[in-house]
């Protein structure tokens, strides 16, 4: 890897200050995508901003009709949450199917949606569950957030703070996982609401 400066701020204000002062900085949470990318020299940020210790980014809140999950909440925390298991059990099951125990203990929901891997699980859950992504600058609907392969609507110095999911009447997620990585070779998330049924697909290309 290339040389870089490592920063570990304690507040969002400190994060924004470092971002504004360092044009080639990258956010580090679980590091499950960024660190391997850096090891392969496909990314060379001048500064790594570790947000894993910022408490205001790690939470799961029941708001009645919605559930809000902080960006640094790990996959294991999602699958273990009584709130999620009771209100959106399909989301807990989705998290349980991600990677191996190491990935689930380190990887975060915010990191996953910010990376927007076309074979990742959370993006289709966000779409089917009418999610709203809150950043340090604004709120974005899931439909507008996911732009293309590995591409989102996040602007320069903009980071994900939390994701708010609507609670469906019922929902289910099924995928055909890669035997090694457990990424979805094809996956479908279906959610039923009063106003209709939402279906989102991950991992499947146009040509099959």
List PLM regions with ranges.
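C-terminal structural segment of proteins
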Residues: 1-208
């Amino acid at each position: 890897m290339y040389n870089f400066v490592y920063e570990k701020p304690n507040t969002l204000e400190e994060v924004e200050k470092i971002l504004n002062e360092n044009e080639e900085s990258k956010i580090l949470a679980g590091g499950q995508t960024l660190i391997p990318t850096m090891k392969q020299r496909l990314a060379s940020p001048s500064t790594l901003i570790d947000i894993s210790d910022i408490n205001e980014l790690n939470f799961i809140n029941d708001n009645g009709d919605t559930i809000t999950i902080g960006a640094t909440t790990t996959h294991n925390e999602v699958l273990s949450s009584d709130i999620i298991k009771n209100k959106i059990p399909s989301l807990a099951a989705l998290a349980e199917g991600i990677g191996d125990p190491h990935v689930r203990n380190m990887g975060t929901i915010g990191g996953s949606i910010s990376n927007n891997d076309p074979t990742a699980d959370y993006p289709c859950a966000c779409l089917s569950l009418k999610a709203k992504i809150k950043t340090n600058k604004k709120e974005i609907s899931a439909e507008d957030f996911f732009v293309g392969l590995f591409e989102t609507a996040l602007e320069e110095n903009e980071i994900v703070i939390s994701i708010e999911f609507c609670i469906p009447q019922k929902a289910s997620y099924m995928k055909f996982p890669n035997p090694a990585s457990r990424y979805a070779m094809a996956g479908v998330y279906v959610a039923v609401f009063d106003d209709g049924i939402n279906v989102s697909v991950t991992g499947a290309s146009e040509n099959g």
